[in-house]
Curated annotation (Swiss-Prot):
PANTHER family: ACETATE KINASE. It holds the Pfam family Acetate_kinase. Keywords: ATP-binding, Cytoplasm, Kinase, Magnesium, Metal-binding, Nucleotide-binding, Transferase. It is found in: Cytoplasm. This is Acetate kinase 1. The lineage of its organism: Bacteria, Pseudomonadati, Pseudomonadota, Gammaproteobacteria, Vibrionales. It comes from Photobacterium profundum (strain SS9). Its cofactor is Mg(2+); Mn(2+). Homodimer. The keyword Cell membrane does not apply. NCBIfam families: ackA.
């Protein structure tokens, strides 16, 4: 147990954590705190069986981290004794960070400086980093950036049609997120299809409270739906994704919204939350589709947007699409959403295997299209934690 890495993945409304052997890939502990900031905030973990505890109404990342360290890890003294390093998923590195780095005060400051580009995530990452440094002061911490995988995007994909000096002077461009997940899915899909990674063309749909699509050509990211920030692209839990930019001016000039109110609305009150005006939880939308108007409306918009992105990204792959892959909490578990999206892609020759699709959830992976489908669609469980553990072990020299 000499190369154990504690991996922390602080999302906008969740905290995934794991203790991973960076050599064997074995996970000794896995857990998820979810629905943070909501009344039903809870934490689940697997360690000598499955466990669950309520964190309290509105509990945030700090409470989840404290519970993890004081109640879960503390129950196994050998874990703390054998932890060699701590790896952190960081959503946005801007142009400051193009690869994983050892964390010091300068890196923390750099991550904080990028918070304007990921306002729901980077502040949560800082909380995780500082809590980890306090709990385990002798261990090295490593930051693994979601933006790194997308550094291979060509200029035509990452530039916005704005005055060019905004890029050269202020680095305003598309960066993309979920890169660690997109990288892992690329590797696994290549193995499943028995193709070399550098010959693989896929479109990967990472669907969770945050969601993005990535066009992967010859194993490298060539386009992705998130942009300068995680706000662009798909409909998400609380984020709007693509909108007409002029809506912002209309809200400000005509309706009198402040800039702060608009920013808060687009990042925290839109997406599924805004469309339902009930919740950001996709499970409510799925369970009530066809029963409640707000759920039906939200799911239709979500699937319409996603299918458009997948279809559009076929244009970046120069005539060959080896697979469409689904991952993330929604991608891995929502058979209805996958079916609705794939049915909208019939023009690509996609044909859903309804039975296989229904079975592919709760950790079960596999092909969810028929043998007649021109393009296979697959459910593949992501493992960002393993990628983070491997990078952490390398940089911490453990």
């Amino acid at each position: 147990m000499s190369k154990l890495v504690l991996v922390l993945n602080c999302g906008s409304s969740s905290l995934k954590f794991a203790i991973v052997d960076a050599v064997s890939g074995e996970e000794h502990l896995t857990g998820l705190a979810e629905c943070l900031h909501l009344p039903e905030a809870r934490i689940k973990w697997k360690l000598d069986g499955k466990h669950e505890a309520q964190l309290g109404d509105g509990a945030a990342h700090e409470e989840a981290l404290a519970f993890m360290v004081e109640s879960i890890i503390a129950s196994k003294p050998e874990f703390a004794a054998n932890l060699a390093a701590i790896g952190h998923r960081v959503v946005h590195g801007g142009e400051k960070f193009t690869q994983s780095v050892l964390i010091d005060e300068t890196v923390v400051k750099g991550i904080e400086d990028c918070s304007a580009l990921a306002p729901l995530h980077n502040p949560a990452h800082i909380i995780g980093i500082k809590a980890a440094q306090k709990a385990f002061p002798a261990l090295k911490n490593v930051a693994v950036f979601d933006t790194a995988f997308h550094q291979t995007m060509p200029e035509e994909a990452y530039l916005y049609a704005l005055p060019y000096n905004l890029y050269t002077d202020h680095a305003i461009r598309r960066y993309g997120m979920h890169g660690t997940s997109h990288l892992f899915i690329t590797r696994v899909t290549a193995e499943l299809l028995e193709k070399p990674v550098d010959e693989l063309n896929i479109i990967n749909c990472h669907l969770g409270n945050g969601a993005s699509v990535c066009a992967i050509k010859n194993g490298k990211s060539v386009d992705t739906s998130m942009g300068l920030t995680p706000l662009e692209g798909l409909v998400m839990g609380t984020r709007c994704g693509d909108i007409d930019p002029a809506i912002i001016f209309h809200l400000h000039d005509t309706l009198g919204y402040s800039v702060e109110k608009i920013n808060n609305m687009l990042t925290k009150e839109s997406g599924l939350q805004g469309l339902t005006q009930v919740t950001s939880d996709c499970r409510f939308v799925e369970d009530n589709y066809g029963k409640k108007e707000e759920a039906t409306r939200a799911m239709d918009v979500f699937c319409h947007r996603l299918a458009k992105y997948v279809a559009g990204y076929t244009a970046t792959l120069e005539g060959r699409l080896d697979a469409i892959t689904f991952t993330g909490g929604i991608g891995e578990n929502s058979a209805p959403i996958r079916e609705m999206v794939l049915n909208r892609l019939a023009i690509l020759g996609v044909e859903v295997d309804v039975e296989a699709n229904l079975k592919a959830r709760f950790g079960k992976e596999g092909v969810i299209t028929t043998a007649n489908s021109r393009v296979p669609a697959m459910v593949v469980s992501t493992n960002e934690e393993l990628v983070i553990a491997e990078d952490t072990a390398r940089l911490a020299a453990i």
